[in-house]
Amino acid sequence: MQIEWDLTGEYIDSGGRETLHDALTDALIVLPREHLRQLAAITIEDEDPRGKALGIWRHDHRGVGIALYAGPHVRSLVRLPPEIRLFALRLHFGYTLFHEVGHHVTRFLNKRTAPPRKAAAVEQKIERWADEYAEKRLGKLVAHWQKPGGLAETPAARQALDLALKALRFDTLVTETAESAGTIVPVRSS
């Protein structure tokens, strides 16, 4: 799998291209390698040519791939306080990547779970499955950041992460199980 950067903007307001690179790297760490199998490329571009998407999963003459659009992510976070933008961008970018990988897993790798084409609400089901996949992976990303040496190891960083989760309208659920006591697991609000 290749990672292709096709950006013309500098994205200074969001910390620059390095922040986008770090956001993608963080998200890839918590994705199982088998879920990326047969994916030709992940492309990071400035804008969706149609002007409506944050990212897309595609299966065309170029193979199977994911395109993430940096411009909409950055614009949606400009009004947030600077101290939480780092986490907000990483969460937003990660969620979009996870959602698109969820489409890949559902439509391409695990065809048994894909709904039949004649089902009444096929697209809604596929979108719901991709959202559920993204929510699970986002929880793993947050847990990864909270480990010793992680991005949200300090109390100030955890507070910024909590504020970013709230700013992105993710309700937080603190699980009290033995293996994940104190871990924040985002649950998408309805």
Describe the role of every protein-language-model region:
Residues 19-38:
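Zn2+-dependent metallopeptidase catalytic core
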Residues 95-108:
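Active-site recognition of the HExxH zinc-binding catalytic motif
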Residues 91, 106-136:
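Post-HEXXH active-site segment of zinc metalloproteases
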Residues 40-47:
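Long, charged, glycine-rich C-terminal linkers/tails
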Residues 13-14, 77-87, 115-121:
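Short, flexible/disordered intra-domain loops and linkers
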Residues 47-91, 107:
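Active-site scaffold of zinc-dependent metalloenzymes
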